[in-house]
Design a protein with these regions (language model features):
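Glycine-rich Rossmann-fold phosphate-binding loop(s) that bind the pyrophosphate
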Residues: 8-9
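Beta-loop-alpha module in the N-terminal Rossmann-like domain of NAD(P)-dependent dehydrogenases
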Residues: 53-84, 96-100
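Hydrophobic Val/Ile/Leu positions in short beta-strands of Rossmann-like dinucleotide-binding domains
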Residues: 3-5, 68
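N-terminal Rossmann-fold NAD(P) dinucleotide-binding loop
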Residues: 12-13
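General beta-strand structural signal in soluble alpha/beta enzymes
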Residues: 68, 91, 117-121
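NAD(P)-binding Rossmann-fold cofactor-contacting core
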Residues: 22-44
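Conserved anion/nucleotide-ligand pocket segment
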Residues: 115-134
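Rossmann-fold NAD(P)-binding glycine/threonine-rich loop
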Residues: 77-80, 94-116
Length: 134
């Protein structure tokens, strides 16, 4: 399973470290960061991990799953575009879903794209959420 994560903070790094190695069924295909952090991210990651700075770049890569682990602002920036393009999205910033209007927009985008919106149990799914995808 090819996965792209949004965010390279504490949770994102935990996922990067957790999927490293041959034993993992998950392949980290890329990481999305703010444009100002792109070069820094490229220097930190192994060369076969792409660095993205926009939803359009992720859509073009066609991963099997995108995992948002950068907070509500990132979810609002990426969520609807990814789902409406047919990409499954796991949301770690579940607090954003408390906004009923926004939640409805995400669900409509998922329906439009034939995608799934995954909301893992607990405040932070991290590696446990990815492990459930096996």
């Amino acid at each position: 399973m090819n996965v792209v994560i949004i965010g390279l903070g504490a949770i994102g790094r935990m996922i990067v470290d957790g999927v490293a190695g041959d034993e993992s069924p998950v392949r980290l295909a890329g990481v999305a960061v703010r444009p100002a952090r792109a070069e820094e991210a490229r220097a930190e990651l192994v060369s076969d991990i792409a660095v993205f700075t926009s939803p359009e770049e992720i859509v073009a890569a066609r991963p099997d799953m995108v995992v948002e682990c950068a907070g509500q602002a990132a979810l609002r920036q990426y969520g609807e575009a990814l789902l409406s393009s047919g990409l499954d999205l796991m949301v770690v910033a579940t607090g954003a879903l408390a906004d009923g209007d926004y939640r409805a927009r995400l669900l409509a985008a998922a329906e439009k794209g034939g995608a799934r919106l995954h909301v893992p149990a607990g405040a932070t799914a991290g590696l446990d959420g990815l492990g459930a995808l096996k």
